[in-house]
């Protein structure tokens, strides 16, 4: 849903007058009560408050099914529903909760992957447990296990990349199932504004994801967030402010989505994005975490000058085949590695520490 955007696209097209706002809070590997995060990461309830959630579409059970203990899962899910029903993330009322079952495991007939027959028994049990919790707690339930099996059976192409993670086409088909379950009608799959709206949704999702799952979260929330540099300025001081900047950028892209669903084209207006905090350089020994030895010389030698300084074994020769002068995009290299074909790969982050990453070979 985060990377393919089909469900939101269909919802926005079907109800353009509603100006719906979607925020994806999922991480790969999440369970109801175990969600791997950086130390200090904002807890799930507080993040739902940031998103001002009115409706929560909850997709649990697939990861828990590997534990093969649906009874325990049922108790944990029940507790989560109770806690969530007691919140007012939007500041006015308790959220409406919809529990979805896990999808089935697709048999890809691959010798390198399980066929899913055994796991589907566990997934079916977790789907049943989810349905029971929904009934007991008076919240809505949508079965995806049975419909996903039906999709696998009738599709001419595989709908998952590995049996459990949906492809773009798989997500498209499942989004149509979800849409019909939620709204009681067929998804607008042939809408004339579909491609424009989907592109706007994906751009908005990309901005949101850079806020929700910021690159190098250890500097934002974790153990390095409290490190202080010049005049006591910390990583958290600057990076938490950047999160608020991305919030504004994401909100402006909601407006682009809403316009696209109505067949209009607007450009995201980022004029209201707060100015970044000026980060003070630690060059010159001004920071408690820096010193002259650590900083070295900030005047970099040219590639040709560097080659002249190398001490090589007899018979060896060094030459420059790539540099920032030849390829300006290669600035800010983060990692280098040699691939199995003998090619040197470089990973750069032009906007370190977030948003843009590039690979070069």
Q: Could you tell me what each predicted segment is?
A:
Residues 1-26, 44-52, 56, 174:
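Serine-esterase "nucleophile elbow" of acetyl-processing enzymes
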Residues 4, 157-299:
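Conserved catalytic region of serine esterases and O-acyltransferases that act on ester linkages
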Residues 4, 8, 41, 45, ...:
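Extracytoplasmic/secreted envelope proteins and their assembly/folding machinery
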Residues 21, 282-361:
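Beta-propeller domains with acidic blade repeats across secreted/periplasmic ectodomains
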Residues 85-96:
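A short helix->loop->beta-strand "cap" motif at the edges of active sites that frequently abuts
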Residues 1-2, 27-33, 55, 61-67, ...:
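Solvent-exposed loop/turn segments at secondary-structure junctions
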Residues 21-26, 54-60, 96-101, 140-143, ...:
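Structural recognition of the beta-strand scaffold that forms the well-ordered cores
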Residues 107-144:
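Substrate-gating cap/lid alpha-helix
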């Amino acid at each position: 849903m985060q990377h393919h955007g089909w469900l939101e696209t269909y919802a926005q097209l079907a109800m353009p007058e509603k100006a719906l706002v979607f925020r994806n809070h999922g991480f790969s590997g999440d369970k109801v009560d175990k969600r791997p995060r950086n130390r200090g990461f904002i807890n799930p309830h507080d993040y739902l408050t940031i998103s001002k959630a009115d409706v929560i579409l909850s997709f649990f059970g697939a990861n828990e099914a590997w534990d093969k203990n649906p009874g325990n899962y049922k108790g944990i899910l029940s507790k989560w529903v109770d806690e969530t029903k007691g919140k007012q993330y939007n500041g006015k009322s308790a959220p409406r909760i919809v529990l979805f079952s896990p999808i089935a495991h697709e048999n890809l007939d691959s010798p390198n992957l399980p066929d899913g027959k055994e796991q589907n028994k566990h997934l079916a049990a977790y789907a049943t447990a989810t349905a029971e919790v929904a009934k007991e707690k008076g919240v809505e339930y949508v079965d995806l296990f049975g419909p996903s099996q039906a999709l696998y059976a009738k599709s001419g192409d595989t709908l998952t990349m590995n049996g459990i993670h949906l492809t773009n086409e798989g997500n498209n088909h499942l989004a149509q199932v979800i849409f019909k379950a939620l709204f009681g009608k067929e998804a607008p799959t042939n809408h004339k504004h579909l491609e424009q709206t989907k592109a706007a949704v994906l751009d908005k999702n990309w901005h949101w994801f850079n806020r929700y799952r910021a690159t190098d979260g250890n500097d934002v929330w974790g153990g390095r967030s409290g490190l202080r540099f010049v005049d006591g300025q910390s990583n958290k001081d600057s990076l938490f402010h950047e999160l608020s900047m991305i919030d504004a950028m994401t909100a402006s892209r909601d407006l682009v989505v809403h316009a696209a669903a109505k067949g209009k084209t607007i450009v995201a207006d980022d004029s209201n994005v707060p100015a970044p905090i000026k980060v003070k350089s630690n060059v010159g020994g001004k920071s408690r975490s820096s010193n002259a030895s650590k900083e070295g010389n900030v005047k970099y030698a040219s590639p040709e000058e560097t080659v002249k300084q190398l001490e090589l074994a007899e018979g060896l020769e060094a030459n420059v085949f790539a540099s920032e002068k030849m390829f300006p995009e290669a600035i800010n290299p983060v990692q280098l590695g040699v691939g199995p074909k003998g090619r040197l790969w470089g990973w750069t982050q032009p906007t370190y520490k977030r948003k843009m990453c590039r690979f070069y070979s």
